[in-house]
Amino acid sequence: MSVTVRVPAKVNVQLAVGGARPDGFHDLANVFLAVGLYDEVTATPADELRITCEGPDAAQVPLDRTNLAARAAIALAARHGLAPDVHLHIAKDIPVAGGMAGGSADAAGALLACDTLWGTNASRGELLDICAELGSDVPFSLVGGAALGTGRGERLRELEVGGTFHWVFAVADGGLSTPAVYGEFDRLSEGVRVPEPVASQELLDALAKGDAVALAAAVSNDLQPAALSLFPSLSDTLEAGRAAGALAALVSGSGPTTAFLTRDADGADAVAQALLASGTCRTARVAPSPAPGATVL
């Protein structure tokens, strides 16, 4: 028997970042939107914990116990007095180290797959607790849809979305380390008073109404200057998307994937083609949002 779970990528339509906390994390007001790019995690009984991976960026995925999917299996097994003997196979379609929570998606997928395979019947609350221990974005990967994340992003309030939003994601050559981007944010903020992060009411209203034009006017990412400082060529990608008619262009999370909101599906296809023709990205992916969270297939 094996269990396969499909898990979406995410885009941050607002990422408001506070100053560094004593524990090194930052308080956030993080509005997540799950998008229709997916990884699939398959759990199969095995004699030991083993990770395999396929997909365009598979070579960049660690196959040892540092992999978040492996850590998820270990955490669930430890809570229930089990050995984490499972083969986790990741079919990877979410960009690696791209600011779209691909690793977090794999953790949420592995957690739900192992819970189903092992019959541990963890409550939603227990699964979310384990997710929060694994990383700030993992709880949202489990939940999907749209949500406001506070604290370091792990405390979620689900949000209403009144329609479908159409996105293009331009995948860069190379990755960005999330800790490095936060470190650059701290460096750029030195000597500056960083305000408390607060969710934008205009943005929440735009999501609830399904209004792409209003959402485009409200999107923001406080990590964008830091990501552009470390990866300056992303400015060219953002400009190419704007020139092609995107309603909004921003770095997705800590980058280096860039996200472009369009008016409709035809607009998304046109922006994707223009981005590819511009030579400013490795590939461009079209995806709608919102998308469901981790789902057993």
Curated annotation (Swiss-Prot):
Disulfide bonds: none
Pathway: Isoprenoid biosynthesis; isopentenyl diphosphate biosynthesis via DXP pathway; isopentenyl diphosphate from 1-deoxy-D-xylulose 5-phosphate: step 3/6
Active site: K10, D137
UniProt-listed Enzyme Commission number(s): 2.7.1.148
Residues reported to bind ATP: P95, V96, A97, G98, G99, M100, A101, G102, G103, S104, A105
A biological-process GO annotation: terpenoid biosynthetic process
Keywords from the UniProt entry: ATP-binding, Isoprene biosynthesis, Kinase, Nucleotide-binding, Transferase
Gene3D superfamilies per record: 3.30.230.10, GHMP kinase, C-terminal domain (3.30.70.890)
GO MF annotations in UniProt: 4-(cytidine 5'-diphospho)-2-C-methyl-D-erythritol kinase activity; ATP binding
Reactions catalysed, as given in the entry: 4-CDP-2-C-methyl-D-erythritol + ATP = 4-CDP-2-C-methyl-D-erythritol 2-phosphate + ADP + H(+)
UniProt-listed NCBIfam families: ispE, PRK03188.1
Function: Catalyzes the phosphorylation of the position 2 hydroxy group of 4-diphosphocytidyl-2C-methyl-D-erythritol.
Family the UniProt entry places it in: Belongs to the GHMP kinase family. IspE subfamily.
Protein name from the UniProt record: 4-diphosphocytidyl-2-C-methyl-D-erythritol kinase
Organism listed in the record: Streptomyces avermitilis (strain ATCC 31267 / DSM 46492 / JCM 5070 / NBRC 14893 / NCIMB 12804 / NRRL 8165 / MA-4680)
Lineage, broadest ranks: Bacteria, Bacillati, Actinomycetota, Actinomycetes, Kitasatosporales
